[in-house]
């Protein structure tokens, strides 16, 4: 009997230690999911937070963007989207810098939508050709000379490095990769993402 009680006690202790480790690992994981520099769309107080690791040269990322926006539109004020960069396509880092430079002029989201819409014209044989993406930025009210200059800023390269480091720590090796309130998708697909978002909405809002 004493041996059984000792075994049970050890199991309970091990469970408590494991729970503590998981609990204390959460803040670090949250930091790796969304950094202060991450572009965000939606109410900052929304209780459902979608984090997407994306590559502007990724065709599937382009396809998913309007789907994610439709989820947000269906639940106004309840969902926030943060974007992280995983420019796995050759040359895609330069397009990321273009977006970040547009962001410095307050035009990030219009620039992103224009760049994604024009993606078939500047992605050639799975390679991002940043020089072909410039026409997509016409008509957005951007100072394109300043965009070109700002693309060389070291802090823009640092954002990409940080996002790639976080992607590696989280096991992200393809795009798009989604996390909803810290939970990864069990399988990839539109319905799977919607299901994860619906679950988070129920948990947060009832």
Residue ranges and their predicted role:
Residues 31-48, 73:
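A short beta-strand-turn-helix
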Residues 46-138, 168-173, 198-206:
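Structural alpha/beta surface segment adjacent to cysteine/selenocysteine redox centers
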Residues 43, 52, 187:
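Conserved strand-loop elements at the edges of beta-sheets that form or border functional pockets
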Residues 20-30:
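Hydrophobic single-pass membrane-insertion segments
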Residues 1-21, 135-206:
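C-terminal cap of thioredoxin/glutaredoxin-like
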Residues 32-33, 63, 159:
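Short secondary-structure boundary/capping elements
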């Amino acid at each position: 009997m004493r041996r059984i009680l000792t075994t049970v006690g050890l199991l309970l202790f091990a469970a408590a230690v494991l729970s503590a480790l998981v609990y204390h690992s959460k803040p670090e994981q949250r930091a790796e999911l969304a950094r202060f520099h991450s572009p965000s769309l939606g109410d900052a107080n929304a209780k459902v937070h979608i984090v997407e690791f994306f590559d502007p040269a990724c065709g599937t990322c382009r396809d998913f963007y309007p789907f994610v926006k439709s989820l947000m539109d269906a639940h106004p004020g309840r969902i926030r989207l943060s974007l992280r960069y995983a420019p796995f396509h050759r040359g895609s880092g330069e397009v990321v810098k273009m977006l970040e430079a547009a962001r410095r002029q307050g035009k990030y989201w219009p620039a992103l939508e224009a760049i994604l819409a024009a993606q078939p014209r500047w992605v050639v044989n799975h390679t991002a050709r940043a020089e072909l993406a410039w026409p997509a930025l016409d008509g957005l009210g951007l100072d394109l000379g300043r965009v070109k200059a700002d693309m060389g800023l070291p802090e823009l390269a640092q954002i990409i490095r940080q996002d790639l480091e976080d992607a590696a720590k989280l096991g992200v090796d393809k795009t798009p990769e989604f996390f909803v309130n810290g939970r990864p998708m069990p399988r990839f697909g539109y319905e799977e993402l919607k299901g994860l978002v619906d679950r988070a909405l129920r948990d947060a809002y009832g």
